[in-house]
């Protein structure tokens, strides 16, 4: 086993980032917690892995990370809390990132499927937490198993990047590592082939608003550091893995429209019904069902408010952020997804009356897509906290939003992650990405088993069409990895999970693995 701190190579002056920048309000809208991801490279589908030694992996990742940190200095930075101003800064001090490389004397077997929804600490790297100025905010662990399969796990902080930015980060890392996997003695200029990035974390500069006042304010920073106030008492959580096949997802979307139309002629209501102008996508239908089923399982009072937090679904709402040509500022690094919540009465968010689910899905879709750059800017600038009268209509999640009546859905199933990551001929592309369970959440000293009501959605292999097919599936070299359905990891408090799994619509459209 090798554990070490990797420092960046010296970089040309033209690639040097600023000394420090304040973390943007959009960054701080994300929870103060770790984002874990694990990528599996299967020897059964990549035969060259069997002959790739642990020493080769260690050398390539050491050299590759040195190059990567020179090109992507945000991963080797540190956070700094200025107590006088209450502001959080990202300080580009080149302190590096942590690398761990280990060999396990056992095969991978079905661990890559992560069907039990539990975190396997064997694969997990040191979790990065913002509590110490000298702690790194990016760590990586490379695990080689006796069968030749490799697991690459990372720990990043939600304040550093959202998932779209994380894929930018991993794409750059995979390119850097592939250079030295292909040729351990490779000589390369740091800026040769490097992606241009914008390190300013000034999201509002892209929204072209008339009001140029700076954010974040002292009020913003003070609130983000305040202890969470739980709307429901913390409780231990249980995990479930739900499989929605491509067929069941299409059936779900179609059924929501059919149910809405069945009652439309006889019911006087202000609900939206399907038409050529009012339509929903598969993601919208799935998110509506999950939000409604979780809310029903909680048995909330009809007057209670539940909020949907969709921090990511794979789309950038500011298209200019993805540009990296020489005339632009480069790819924007930081959180770019709408850090807002969508509040509704729990009576509206219910699967008990299935005819209302299309309307709920339509509301989710329009709320998300109508967050324009200008609205996003205003939400961040003027705070709009959910329960403070002085901060507008309540569009931005407080620290407590993931621990109360709310539901958080992170859907990365449509992001082409596998196509973008390539570690070269020996390691290849990852076969799958998984969270391998939801790791414990620590927020200002309070540790919970999981964020209650959190759904993390990834793409499932096309071969996963039944529980039996999932259990028997073993990829082979040359298999065409066609897009499949969606695998949903759901975390809920234990006493409510049974009610969730008894939901008749979930039983109709999902397989419990």
UniProtKB/Swiss-Prot annotation:
Enzyme Commission designation: 2.3.1.-
Keyword tags: Acyltransferase, Transferase
The family this protein is said to belong to: Belongs to the plant acyltransferase family.
Name of the molecule in the record: Acyltransferase uat1
EC top class named in words: transferase
Active site (catalytic residues): 158 (proton acceptor)
Record has Acyltransferase as a keyword: yes
Name of the coding gene: uat1
Top-level lineage group: Eukaryota
Pfam families: Transferase
The keyword Zinc appears for this protein: no
């Amino acid at each position: 086993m090798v554990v070490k701190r990797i420092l960046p190579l010296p970089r040309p002056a033209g690639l040097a980032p600023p000394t420090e920048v304040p973390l943007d309000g959009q960054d701080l809208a994300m929870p103060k917690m770790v984002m874990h991801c694990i990528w599996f490279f299967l020897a059964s589908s990549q035969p060259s892995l069997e002959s790739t030694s642990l020493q080769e992996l260690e050398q390539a990742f050491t050299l590759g990370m040195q190059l990567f940190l020179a090109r992507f200095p945000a991963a080797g930075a540190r956070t700094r809390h200025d107590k006088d101003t209450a502001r959080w800064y990202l300080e580009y001090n080149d302190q590096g990132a942590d690398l761990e490389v280990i060999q396990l004397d056992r095969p991978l077997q079905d661990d890559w499927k992560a069907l039990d929804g539990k975190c396997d600490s064997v694969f997990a790297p040191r979790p990065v937490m913002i509590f110490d100025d000298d702690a790194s905010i990016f760590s990586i662990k490379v695990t080689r198993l006796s069968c030749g399969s490799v697991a690459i796990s990372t720990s990043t902080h939600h304040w550093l990047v959202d998932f779209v930015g994380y894929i930018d980060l991993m794409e750059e890392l995979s390119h850097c590592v592939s250079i030295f996997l292909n040729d351990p003695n490779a000589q390369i200029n740091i800026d040769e082939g490097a992606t241009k990035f914008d390190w300013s974390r000034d999201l509002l500069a892209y929204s072209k608003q008339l009001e140029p006042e700076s954010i974040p304010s002292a009020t913003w920073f003070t609130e983000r550091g305040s202890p969470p106030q739980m709307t429901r008492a913390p409780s231990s959580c249980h995990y479930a893995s739900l499989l929605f096949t491509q067929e069941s997802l299409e059936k779900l979307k179609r059924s929501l429209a059919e149910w809405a139309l069945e009652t439309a002629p006889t019911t006087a209501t202000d609900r939206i019904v399907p038409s050529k102008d009012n339509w929903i996508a598969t993601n919208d239908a799935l998110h509506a069902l999950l939000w409604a089923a979780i809310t029903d399982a909680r048995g909330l009072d009809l007057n209670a408010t539940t909020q949907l937090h969709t921090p990511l679904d794979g789309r950038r709402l500011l298209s200019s952020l993805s540009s990296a040509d020489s005339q632009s500022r480069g790819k924007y690094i930081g959180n770019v997804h709408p850090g807002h919540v969508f509040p509704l009465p729990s009576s509206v968010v219910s699967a008990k009356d299935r005819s209302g689910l299309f309307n709920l899905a339509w509301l989710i879709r329009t709320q998300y897509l109508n967050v324009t750059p200008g609205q996003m800017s205003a939400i961040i600038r003027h705070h709009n906290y959910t329960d403070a009268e002085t901060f507008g209509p309540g569009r931005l999640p407080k620290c407590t939003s993931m621990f109360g009546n709310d539901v958080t859905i992170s859907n990365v199933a449509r992001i082409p992650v596998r196509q973008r990551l390539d570690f070269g001929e020996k390691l290849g592309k990852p076969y799958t990405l998984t969270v391998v369970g939801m790791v414990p959440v620590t927020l200002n000293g309070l540790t919970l088993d999981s964020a209650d009501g959190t759904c993390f959605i990834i793409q499932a292999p096309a071969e996963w069409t039944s529980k039996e097919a999932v259990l028997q599936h073993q990829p082979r070299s040359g298999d065409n990895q066609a897009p499949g359905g969606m695998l949903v990891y759901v975390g809920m408090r234990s006493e409510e999970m049974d009610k969730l799994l008894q939901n008749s619509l979930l039983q109709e459209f999902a397989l419990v693995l």
